[in-house]
């Protein structure tokens, strides 16, 4: 059964032979999991004390075996996409390496993320609204420049801002109608002074 409070992990890049592969971890145990598998190049550095929004070079290890050299990025909540603690492990992009690192992360306490679960958490934690969550998928699926631009406008809140504006206008109109029903004479007076000039 899926628990929305589990620490989750997934491969964030296309799985292919490439220069870099990224494994993303999000949740309250992200740093604890990292501490079990990451050895910073500077051995004096405590993994739990790594600074927010900084890159750290080191090795991913499975016990004493070095699996890969990597760069780790720390994004502590609420200053991350999901508003949770997030760790990104940038390793070499070979298929075998990426899956080995992901399996180490899963073995040490994370659960494999469902498709779209990072964006779902961003929505549930108030980082983005529903319109912006839909825009993320539209951006990923965009096939041309116009679709990309429209998705970015929506992701930046363009549609959300317009919806908020329309909501405020509707609330104002409802209040005006309720006022007219409560006091018809006042309504007639208001119409006289708010009607457009001929």
Task: Report each predicted region and the residues it spans.
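A glycine-rich (often HGG/GG-containing) alpha/beta subdomain
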Residues: 1-149, 153, 157
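An accessory alpha-helical subdomain
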Residues: 150-173, 181-182, 186-192
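Conserved small/polar residues in nucleotide/adenosyl-binding loops
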Residues: 193-198
């Amino acid at each position: 059964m899926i628990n929305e409070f589990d620490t989750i992990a997934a491969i964030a890049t296309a799985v292919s032979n490439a220069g870099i592969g990224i494994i993303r971890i999000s949740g309250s145990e992200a740093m604890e999991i990292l501490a079990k598998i990451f050895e910073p190049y500077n051995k004096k550095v405590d993994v739990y004390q790594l600074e927010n929004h900084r890159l750290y070079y080191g090795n991913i290890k499975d016990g004493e075996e070095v699996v890969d050299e990597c760069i780790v990025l720390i994004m502590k909540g609420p200053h991350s996409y999901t508003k949770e603690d997030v760790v990104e492990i940038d390793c070499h992009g070979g298929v075998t390496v990426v899956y080995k690192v992901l399996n180490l992360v899963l073995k040490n306490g994370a659960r494999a993320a469902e498709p779209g679960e990072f964006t779902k958490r961003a929505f549930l934690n108030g980082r983005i609204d529903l319109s912006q969550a839909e825009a993320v998928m539209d951006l990923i699926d965009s096939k041309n420049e116009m679709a990309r631009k429209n998705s970015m406008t929506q992701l930046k809140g363009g549609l959300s801002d317009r919806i908020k504006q329309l909501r405020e206008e509707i609330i104002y109109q409802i209040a005006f109608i309720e006022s007219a029903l409560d006091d018809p004479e006042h309504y007639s007076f208001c119409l006289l002074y708010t009607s457009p000039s001929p």
